[in-house]
A protein has these predicted regions:
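Terminal amphipathic alpha-helical/low-complexity segments used for targeting or macromolecular assembly
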Residues: 55-56, 62-143
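Left-handed beta-helix
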Residues: 2-3, 8-15, 20-21, 26-33, ...
Length: 143
């Protein structure tokens, strides 16, 4: 468990879950064993996941990345240039309609590789359980 996290009432973390710095796990969220919750991410109340929650993102419902955690990023002093680079990466990774491998390659060639973007890409590449899906992703092939 990282530093500065928020773990609200009723949140359930199974064994070997890793929660990175400044992550927020809202009330009554459920996290499957061996999952990772990324830095400055947020799980909305009543969410559940058996996949990794990427850093800097808001996760909702089941395995669904809704958006960047823009309020959290600003509260922690991230400037507009860093947020813009993350937003560009986010749009390709979670809204671009590409499979994750192609999306990673596109981000590496088209987006400014700031420290934050590199951290996001490294987190996704290191995932053993897979990361949460972008909103609107056809998940039928994964079920």
């Amino acid at each position: 468990v990282g530093n500065g996290i928020v773990l609200a009432g009723g949140a359930l973390l199974a064994g070997h879950v890793a929660v990175e710095d400044k992550a927020i796990i809202s009330g009554n969220c459920v996290v499957h064993q061996f999952c990772r919750i990324g830095k400055l991410s947020m799980m909305r109340g009543l969410s559940r996941t058996s996949r990794d929650v990427p850093p800097f993102c808001i996760m909702d419902e089941t395995h669904t990345v809704k958006s960047l955690n823009l309020i959290g990023l600003r509260r922690h002093g991230m400037d507009a240039k860093r947020v813009r680079a993350l937003k560009n990466a986010f749009l390709i990774l979670f809204r671009g309609g590409l499979n994750m491998q192609n999306a990673l390659e596109q981000v590496e060639t088209e987006v400014e590789l700031t420290e934050d973007v590199t951290e996001l890409l490294d987190f996704i590449k290191a995932s053993k359980r897979g990361v949460c899906f972008g909103e609107g992703t056809d998940v039928s092939e994964f079920v």
